[in-house]
Amino acid sequence: MIITIFGPPGSGKGTQSSLLIAKYNLKLISVGDLLRNIISSSSELGKKIKGTVESGNLIQDEIICGLLRDQLALVDDNCLLDGFPRNLNQAHFLTQVLQEKYNRDVDIVVELQLDDNIAIDRLKNRLACLDCKSIYSVSSFKSTTCAKCKSTRLEKRIDDADMSAINKRISEYHLQMKGLREYYKGKLLTIDANLSVDEVTQEIESKISCNLV
């Protein structure tokens, strides 16, 4: 089974992806994690990507698609793609690569739909563990240690630090989603991400179960 999950910044893609790969025994390919790892390497590519991310712009398709192709070469056809595709061009690329490698396409597409004001509030308060990628809200999480892996490396993401960049990312997401919804019509499961984590998980699993019947 090949699942892709996307949604606006702050919609909980990483959290839901972690739960889904455990339930359905899938390999995870997270575009966001790949980019953050490259940025932390301080390579020339990392510096270039960091500047793009901090400004709220999208990374060039050439870079993203190259990273994805490399990752797909390492997994079988039971995987979950977190945060890819991000536009119609990337969707066409994904179909081509999956057809070449597995002679198939994506089975299920999950879109997490989130109100803009809630997305902004979550991003302003988001705290991430640099080691295990767990996400917390600074308004409710007062510890200096990650509850999951006990790491003390808790920081705000660089792309959450600037309000204008946040607004730009959200606007760009809505702009790109119009084409993606049409492209994946018939495979698209829309989920209300304004709900609690558990409620979102239940809705996703329920719709996936119905889709697999």
From Swiss-Prot:
The keyword Cytoplasm applies. Residues 30-59 are annotated as: NMP. Residues 125-160 are annotated as: LID. GO terms for molecular function: adenylate kinase activity; ATP binding; zinc ion binding. Gene3D superfamilies: P-loop containing nucleotide triphosphate hydrolases. It catalyses: AMP + ATP = 2 ADP. GO terms for cellular component: cytoplasm. Its EC number is 2.7.4.3. It comes from the Bacteria. SUPFAM superfamilies: P-loop containing nucleoside triphosphate hydrolases (SSF52540). Pathway: Purine metabolism; AMP biosynthesis via salvage pathway; AMP from ADP: step 1/1. Zn(2+) binds at C129, C132, C146, C149. GO terms for biological process: AMP salvage. Keywords: ATP-binding, Cytoplasm, Kinase, Metal-binding, Nucleotide biosynthesis, Nucleotide-binding, Transferase, Zinc. AMP binds at R36, N57, L58, I59, G83, F84, P85, R86, Q90, R157, R169. ATP binds at G10, S11, G12, K13, G14, T15, R126, I135, Y136, L195. It is found in: Cytoplasm. Monomer. Belongs to the adenylate kinase family. Consists of three domains, a large central CORE domain and two small peripheral domains, NMPbind and LID, which undergo movements during catalysis. The LID domain closes over the site of phosphoryl transfer upon ATP binding. Assembling and dissambling the active center during each catalytic cycle provides an effective means to prevent ATP hydrolysis. Some bacteria have evolved a zinc-coordinating structure that stabilizes the LID domain. Catalyzes the reversible transfer of the terminal phosphate group between ATP and AMP. Plays an important role in cellular energy homeostasis and in adenine nucleotide metabolism. This is Adenylate kinase. It comes from Wolbachia sp. subsp. Drosophila simulans (strain wRi). The gene is adk.
